[in-house]
Amino acid sequence: MPPASKWPKVLPPLTAEQRRISDDFMRLWHETLPHRYGAIEAFNHNFPVRHSPPGFRTTLEIGAGLGEHLHYEKLTPEQEENYYANEFRENMAAGIRERFPRVQTVVADCQQPLDFRAGFFDRIIAVHVLEHLPNLPAAIRECYRLVEKSRGRLLVVIPCEGSPPYTLARKISAERVYKKRYGGDYSWFYTREHINLPHEVLGELHPYFTVEARRFFPLPFLPFVFTNLCIGLSLVPRARPLAVE
């Protein structure tokens, strides 16, 4: 009998109060991060811009938050019109519509099939998203379906979750912001948010994409998860997926 799959990961249910805090804090953190932690935000968003395919027309950004990434883009009117910002939380999507009315805001779960034809997107961007997804393989399969196969790119930034630098950074940043606003224990929040480690994300990407470019931050000359905060990946879709066990 084959071993049971770990996907999708099952998270403990939230109380109504935890759900309220979760939605509120996610928006608060997205509002706070650009103003207090500019260096890491610059890496998060400049990496996808620098590795975008030349002459791209269509973009899907999954987990777009409040649209922070759009501040780093220099889009033509056509590229802006064909930029689809996908967000799961309606309270976050409302912020995208307000700030960036010329892009297309799509409220949907990126772990489910999205209403676009195969190969529609020249770029798919996922900045600090893949670590959050209980059904990560389904999201990656959908990204593979949607990306244009001859010149499209999947542009990803993930945290070095579990590394000493990242653990310390969370302690002095997100945890501090959380406790100032809500008090109490923070661990229930982050342990159900950052549920996929870098090796898990890379393992699920491998059957569908090859790595064209990789960069660690802030120490690219020490390219190891345990010495860094984030990893940027420019990924090329395989002509055919590898067999998935």
Regions inferred by a protein language model and the residue ranges of each:
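S-adenosyl-L-methionine-dependent methyltransferase catalytic module, highlighting the catalytic core
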Residues: S5-E17, D24-R27, E31-H35, P134-K149, ...
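Conserved class I S-adenosyl-L-methionine
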Residues: F56-G65
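Residues at the starts of beta-strands that form the adenosine-phosphate
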Residues: T58, N82, R153
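Class I SAM-dependent methyltransferase SAM/SAH-binding core
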Residues: G65-Q112
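A short acidic, Gly/Pro-enriched loop at the edge of an enzyme's catalytic core
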Residues: Q111-R123
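A short beta-strand submotif of the Rossmann-like class I SAM-dependent methyltransferase core
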Residues: R123-V129
